[in-house]
Swiss-Prot record:
This is Small ribosomal subunit protein eS8. One of its GO terms (molecular function) is structural constituent of ribosome. Keywords: Ribonucleoprotein, Ribosomal protein. It holds the Pfam family Ribosomal_S8e. Belongs to the eukaryotic ribosomal protein eS8 family.
Length: 125
């Protein structure tokens, strides 16, 4: 779990004395770490009675060609580069900004698979 409350340190590095402890609503969740495999989704209930779709596994992506604006669904072969974490390349984990290899060509992921429940990508040269 990840705590998403405000920092206990000032900009100068000094400590802020907390007036209260941590609260449950400040708590985050584990990241989805979307892998390349058959499609597997999970619904998560969020604050306000809303819902998020976590994409746990997927082997397809909606790839848009920026030159002609056409979108095609293609299978994902592998992850080439990931700026979020260099170890995600070896584990084939998809995040926003990761570069993937597909039969259509090399593409950069533009959606957040763990938040949106779908993989959208743009072809790169």
């Amino acid at each position: 779990m990840r705590w998403q409350g405000s920092s206990r340190r000032k900009a100068t590095g000094g400590k802020i004395i907390a007036a209260r402890g941590k609260r449950k609503f400040e708590m985050g969740r584990e990241s989805a770490e979307t892998r390349i495999s058959d499609v597997k989704r999970k619904n998560v209930h969020t604050m306000g009675g809303n819902r998020k779709v976590r994409l746990l596994q997927s082997n397809v992506a909606n790839i848009t060609n920026p030159k002609d604006g056409k979108t095609v669904t293609a299978t994902i072969e592998t992850v080439i580069d990931n700026t979020a974490n260099k170890h995600y390349v070896r584990r084939n984990i998809l995040t926003k900004g990761s570069v993937i290899r597909t039969p259509v060509g090399t593409a950069r992921v533009t959606s957040r698979p763990g938040q949106d429940g779908v993989i959208n990508a743009v072809l790169i040269e």
